[in-house]
Amino acid sequence: MPALSTGSGNDTGLYELLVALPAQLQPHVDSQEDLTFLWDVFGEKSLHSLVKIHEKLHYYEKQNPVPILQGAAALADDLAEELQNKPLNSEIRELLKLLSKPNVKALLSVHDTVAQKNYDPVLPPMPDDIDNEEDSVKIIRLVKNREPLGATIKKDEQTGAIVVARIMRGGAADRSGLIHVGDELREVNGIPVEDKRPEEIIQILAQSQGAITFKIIPSIKEETPSKEGKMFIKALFDYDPNEDKAIPCKEAGLSFKKGDILQIMSQDDATWWQAKHEGDANPRAGLIPSKHFQERRLALRRPEILVQPLKVSSRKSSGFRRSFRLSRKDKKTNKSMYECKRSDQYDTADVPTYEEVTPYRRQTNEKYRLVVLVGPVGVGLNELKRKLLISDTQHYGVTVPHTTRPRRSQESDGVEYIFISKHLFETDVQNNKFIEYGEYKNNYYGTSIDSVRSVLAKNKVCLLDVQPHTVKHLRTLEFKPFVIFIKPPSIERLRETRKNAKIISSRDDQGAAKPFTEDDFQEMIKSAQIMESQYGHLFDKTIVNDDLAVAFNELKTTFDKLETDTHWVPVSWLHS
């Protein structure tokens, strides 16, 4: 490996070395996993800050600065007193004014504290009323300012004692290292709490500002330091602790929205995890329901929260056929003729809670991620797809569908369709080689997995639109799909913007384009709501197609970022 240049000729170039390392090491790293790890490690902001601090300290160690005296504040007071007895001129007045300023006095006081190495806090004297036969008692004084204490308490059912139930990571109690789970609380600011309810004690703590003094009996059980590595999860549901009757302390809860990335700080409690929002500078963690607990209570409520399955009417079946439209040149075949075999209803087996994720950025030598487009019939998904293809035919591609119908004279195999026998089609169906398939007039039509691979192998972005239930089957290490939901605007905007537009209808055998009706708008809105409710946790991006040009620009910008930016993907995609 060639020598690395730090950009400086002395030993203070550690920071420059840290910045240069990832790019220098990239040609020598074989696996994507190792490269991602190196970028994460050397790109950590906290590490950069520590290195800068190290360099500053290293510099001052060489200078070996030592305080000239340990009583600068007293000396300044003496000087001011002496100057008062001298004839006052403008310079003396200015100096006296400076020495009398509170910030200058505070600076000199801090200087003396550092010079005298007087860092330990002054604890209050030990109370005289402690029984000699009583258990060991600790007197703890914490300064919490306006932040929460960062601990929860409960009443022990057997002894009736008030004990610490949980220490919140990053809170005042956690940072102090003096309070632990299981410690028995006896007094708060001199107020006995043995006969009080936890709610009353919480009120005392809430009303206390600045320093708080605790009298506690330490827990016999020693806590083992947590060795958990960094774990990030994507929330697949909305959560508001104020609406959760099961949470032990609503004030300690952490609210989040579907799609938020959370860093898990502790899983010590099987029911309530501690987490914080990724990238949040606030170190304090909050409580969230654990994966197992959330799955269990959602499963119990499931019969009540299930929505009606989305029935595939003759009109809605055209949504299945969208995967074929842009692959064919014969406009006469553009009619709703497919009955989707795998979209009779939404799959309700999964209980979405959390998904463990990790940062991922596509490398230049990697295949593009599969782009999956989802949306209700009539929302404009096909037009957006068509505009994308026209914008760059060398960069975007679509699949060629398979069919068992006879080839027509003007058609070429592999262009409009891939023509195969009925027996081979049915065999491929049994072997799960089709993403979706349907039947019309005794002929099969379908989109195969190999057709997706073919587009990706040409170093193109494959645009695939499918029914939403199919998305979860595509979420694999091979495809790493990015799922975009094209959502309709409000029904008022639909009436305003689509009044002159037309939709392909399947109510007659000709599949003629007819103007939108009020029923079409209602079906579009209802279908979108069900899709979002049942499969919204699988969508990476939602674009509202209110204005086609605006929606297209947003879609194009999303694709550009997808190819260059870092995104959160399931851990299984990188560590399978």
From Swiss-Prot:
<keyword id="KW-0472">Membrane</keyword>
<feature type="domain" description="Guanylate kinase-like">
    <location>
        <begin position="368"/>
        <end position="560"/>
    </location>
</feature>
<dbReference type="GO" id="GO:0005886">
    <property type="term" value="C:plasma membrane"/>
</dbReference>
<keyword id="KW-0965">Cell junction</keyword>
<comment type="subunit">
    <text>Heterodimer; able to heterodimerize via its C-terminal L27 domain with LIN7A, LIN7B and LIN7C. Forms a tripartite complex composed of DLG1, MPP7 and LIN7 (LIN7A or LIN7C). Interacts with DLG1 via its N-terminal L27 domain. Interacts with PALS1 and PATJ.</text>
</comment>
<dbReference type="InterPro" id="IPR036892">
    <property type="entry name" value="L27_dom_sf"/>
</dbReference>
<dbReference type="Pfam" id="PF02828">
    <property type="entry name" value="L27"/>
</dbReference>
<dbReference type="GO" id="GO:0005923">
    <property type="term" value="C:bicellular tight junction"/>
</dbReference>
<dbReference type="GO" id="GO:0005911">
    <property type="term" value="C:cell-cell junction"/>
</dbReference>
<dbReference type="Pfam" id="PF07653">
    <property type="entry name" value="SH3_2"/>
</dbReference>
<keyword id="KW-1003">Cell membrane</keyword>
<dbReference type="GO" id="GO:0016328">
    <property type="term" value="C:lateral plasma membrane"/>
</dbReference>
<dbReference type="Pfam" id="PF00595">
    <property type="entry name" value="PDZ"/>
</dbReference>
<dbReference type="InterPro" id="IPR027417">
    <property type="entry name" value="P-loop_NTPase"/>
</dbReference>
<feature type="domain" description="PDZ">
    <location>
        <begin position="139"/>
        <end position="220"/>
    </location>
</feature>
<dbReference type="InterPro" id="IPR001478">
    <property type="entry name" value="PDZ"/>
</dbReference>
<feature type="modified residue" description="Phosphoserine">
    <location>
        <position position="409"/>
    </location>
</feature>
<feature type="domain" description="L27 2">
    <location>
        <begin position="65"/>
        <end position="122"/>
    </location>
</feature>
<dbReference type="InterPro" id="IPR008145">
    <property type="entry name" value="GK/Ca_channel_bsu"/>
</dbReference>
<dbReference type="GO" id="GO:0005912">
    <property type="term" value="C:adherens junction"/>
</dbReference>
<keyword id="KW-0963">Cytoplasm</keyword>
<protein>
    <recommendedName>
        <fullName>MAGUK p55 subfamily member 7</fullName>
    </recommendedName>
</protein>
<dbReference type="InterPro" id="IPR036034">
    <property type="entry name" value="PDZ_sf"/>
</dbReference>
<keyword id="KW-0677">Repeat</keyword>
<keyword id="KW-0796">Tight junction</keyword>
<dbReference type="GO" id="GO:0071896">
    <property type="term" value="P:protein localization to adherens junction"/>
</dbReference>
<dbReference type="InterPro" id="IPR001452">
    <property type="entry name" value="SH3_domain"/>
</dbReference>
<dbReference type="InterPro" id="IPR008144">
    <property type="entry name" value="Guanylate_kin-like_dom"/>
</dbReference>
<dbReference type="InterPro" id="IPR036028">
    <property type="entry name" value="SH3-like_dom_sf"/>
</dbReference>
<feature type="domain" description="SH3">
    <location>
        <begin position="228"/>
        <end position="298"/>
    </location>
</feature>
<dbReference type="InterPro" id="IPR050716">
    <property type="entry name" value="MAGUK"/>
</dbReference>
<feature type="region of interest" description="Phospho-regulated basic and hydrophobic (PRBH) motif">
    <location>
        <begin position="289"/>
        <end position="383"/>
    </location>
</feature>
<comment type="function">
    <text>Acts as an important adapter that promotes epithelial cell polarity and tight junction formation via its interaction with DLG1. Involved in the assembly of protein complexes at sites of cell-cell contact.</text>
</comment>
<dbReference type="InterPro" id="IPR020590">
    <property type="entry name" value="Guanylate_kinase_CS"/>
</dbReference>
<keyword id="KW-0728">SH3 domain</keyword>
<dbReference type="InterPro" id="IPR014775">
    <property type="entry name" value="L27_C"/>
</dbReference>
<dbReference type="InterPro" id="IPR004172">
    <property type="entry name" value="L27_dom"/>
</dbReference>
<dbReference type="Pfam" id="PF00625">
    <property type="entry name" value="Guanylate_kin"/>
</dbReference>
<dbReference type="GO" id="GO:0005938">
    <property type="term" value="C:cell cortex"/>
</dbReference>
<comment type="similarity">
    <text>Belongs to the MAGUK family.</text>
</comment>
<keyword id="KW-0597">Phosphoprotein</keyword>
<dbReference type="InterPro" id="IPR035599">
    <property type="entry name" value="MPP7_SH3"/>
</dbReference>
